[in-house]
Amino acid sequence: MTEPIVRTEPLGGTALARAAIDGQRGEWYPEIPGSEQAWKARAEAVRASSGREWLDAIRPALSASGAAGARLARVAAGRGVVVTTGQQPGLFGGPIYTWSKALSALALADEIEAATGVPAAPVFWAANDDADFAEASWTAVAVAGGAERLTVAAGAPLGRTMADMPLGDVAPAFAALLRACGATVDARPIDVVRAAYRAGTTVGGAYLSLLRDLFEPFGIAVLDAAHASIAEAARPLLLRALDRASVVADALRERDEAIRAAGFTPQVAEVPGLSLVFERARDGGDKRRIPVTEAAAVAAQGDSPRRGLLSPNVLLRPVIERAILPTVAYVAGPGELSYFALVTAVAPALGLDSPLAVPRWSTTILEPHVVRILSSLGLEEAELAEPHRAEGRLARKAMSPALARALADLRQEVGRHSGAVSSALEASDLPLPTQVIDGAQRAIDHRLERLERRIVAAAKRRETETMTQIATARGALFPLGTRQERALNMLPFMARHGNVITDRMITGARAHARWLVGRNPETNPSAAAQAARRASSSESDVSAPRVESARTADA
């Protein structure tokens, strides 16, 4: 095999996310249209509730050019709809799922337009108004011997938004990214990084520049959530959220209680006493969440220049987005699907339409060198999800048959003699319980387990090349202990394989989009992929060990 495999995966997530995907809990989630006719009705309803000039109001925040600009213009002129998705900044564009989300939105927009005749365009919401530098400061790459975490330091004190956070020294991380790319067939992704992550820019600015350069040729527009035109369009809605802060708080409390009563855990913890609106000084600085007790007073001041810039929190943002964009659907990750159960309590409390969330497409990329390692070592992917499992099995396999037999015989002899002592003790009249023998045997078993671990460790040290290959495969498939899609950076894959990667991702995303529009369970590509792997090996399903990462916005 000389080309990578792009494999569709089940999305996974919490029990609440899976309930959303399965169409359960209709009291918390708007129903996903189940046919082309239903999507047509959904699109027409969104058209009817959206203004004709929506694009003019936020055009500067999109600044779309090329194929993305042309598609947006066509949709606006035809009173069409948009399919949105988004993500907070991540170093060098963040993990693979940034692309999974963007290409899912593209595929769904294409499918909705083809099925309904309503013009549709994908829009990626770059959440540069987010202040989580810890999330924005890292990415991961797969290298020989494992995965490497790349980080940058903050260029200013923490607390400010990523649009305002100066980019620190990125040179070491960029050098590591280049090394991870290895032999490349497409230099463009690296050239885009070099142009975007330049001295004097911000974390959010670099992220925005990179995504626009890479997404716009596909027709995907990238919206800067921190742009002044978004703040202007959202301000009346943010003031309404402040004016009704108590009503919103009550609605969220009731929904939180209902979710818990149904046996689920809310994705976003309730913070009593705080509204869903942030404020920061107009000249930059830290964001603060406005207390409910201050909310009405802030709302009453309206557009006073004495007040700072307002922005929504994670539960209010989807409601704002749906109000300022003709959003027919938001393509969501599992964490987002979970917290949309709360979002749909916020919207009616504000007298606004609830946004519709649909599950994104999910993938694992298997490069040829990883497939060769799995094949040559006889590894199952699921073994790599657990630390030391594959290493231990292969190390035991590498032990001499005589040593393995001797260990097994020793365990058997200990058990046999312990049983004999226990039987003899029972037959005697000594005032000593047999539990003493049981305790002694457990102590001996523990010692034997330690001995075996030390022997296995010695075998691992001898099998250095094999252990390195295992670490390489694990770093490629379960980097830093999580699923590949949630940690590894996309750019090395693109640099090594060119358009093959994105072409195959689009193919997978289109199959997923066709299922979303038709909603026939028999055509669900994620379920089909899972069933196929389970049929081939009941223990080797890569998705079985639900290892999740610290990535929070899509987690």
Positions of predicted regions on the chain:
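Short acidic, glycine/serine/threonine-rich loops at helix termini
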Residues: I96-Y97, D132-T139, A234-L238
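Long, compositionally biased intrinsically disordered regions
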Residues: Q37, L210-G302, K397-A555
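N-terminal leader/transition segments
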Residues: M1-A64
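Glycine-rich phosphate/pyrophosphate-binding loops
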Residues: G93-P95, A109-A134, P355
